Amino acid sequence: MAKKYALFIALILVVSYFSLTSGSFSVRPAELLSTLFQIDPNPQYEILLFDLRLPRVVMAAIIGLGLGIAGAVIQAITRNGLADPGILGINAGAGAGIVAFMLLFQGQKEVTSIAAAMGMPLFGLIGGLIAAILIYIFAWHRGNLDSGRIILVGIAINSGFSALSLFLSLKMDPQDYQMAMVWKNGSIWSANWTYITAVLPWMLLFIPILIGKSRLLDTIRFDEDTVRSLGISSNKEKTILLVACVAIISACVSVAGSMAFVGLIAPHISRRLAGVEHRYILPLSGLIGMLLVISADFAGKLFFQPAEVPAGIILAILGVPYFLYLLFKQKKGENA
């Protein structure tokens, strides 16, 4: 596994390098190193790298890490390889909470104060938790959380919260509405060190909790009777895991909008490479998620100059065919 981790870390570093040096204003390798390590740095390059490009790369890495790990956990909880935070409605719930924040505090999305940056993840957490609670209420069947119902309920909740977000967005003034639309499409254009400072504690708190539950996740993938026979309170553990996932997803959505399909694609690739043990799946899912989001942000920035396509749209272009492929593959397996 160490070689696989090293491979993806190397790929992340390569894409990050090109993201830092490429664009409308290119940076040579020597200038990049001298600026990053403060060896006779050029003030122009300092502004370009430390204020504009480096925050985007760091933010993309944090978001990819969080969504990749959260997606793997959600797939384990639901025992469904097609589960994804976006499909389940958690992204939409968190998004509705953050749109409400933007409506209540007009223009606060651009405020760089730490108070405003901290407020958005909290509103997102409230929205995400409401979505998760509704999933629990409607997916609860015969004293247990029905893994099959979770997906159907999640799709309905996703539609409901998306409609609510649109309704709230229409109440904004034109400038804030335009900002909200760009954000909802999954954009990292507004990344800055304040938002990184705001989202990082959520990752440092909840990701270790999920990784610490790796052995439990290996057990939860069995049927409910087997889990109960091992003396594990399945519903209690699922609740803890789901709350941790919602917190991570809400923090990611608050600073970058909806990054669809990261939580679907990364765990699938990870399971193919790492097998069935979650102590390997979760870290690898995080690394793959980092690579996906950094690459999508870089592609949207580079290939459509002078315009810029949000990373969320690039990920959706990749994710929809992959989702249909998995759906076809699952259906084919059931008919075999």
Curated annotation (Swiss-Prot):
PANTHER family: FERRIC ENTEROBACTIN TRANSPORT SYSTEM PERMEASE PROTEIN, IRON-UPTAKE SYSTEM PERMEASE PROTEIN FEUC
Gene: feuC
Family the entry assigns: Belongs to the binding-protein-dependent transport system permease family. FecCD subfamily.
Entry-linked InterPro entries: ABC_BtuC-like, ABC_transptr_permease_BtuC
Inducing factors: Induced by Btr in iron-limited conditions.
Name assigned to this protein: Iron-uptake system permease protein FeuC
Positions of transmembrane segments: 7-27, 57-77, 85-105, 120-140, 150-170, 191-211, 246-266, 280-300, 308-328
Species whose genome carries this gene: Bacillus subtilis (strain 168)
Pfam family, one: FecCD
Subcellular locations according to the entry: Cell membrane
Lineage: Bacteria, Bacillati, Bacillota, Bacilli, Bacillales
The keyword Kinase appears for this protein: no
The UniProt record lists the keyword Nucleotide-binding: no
Membrane association type: Multi-pass membrane protein
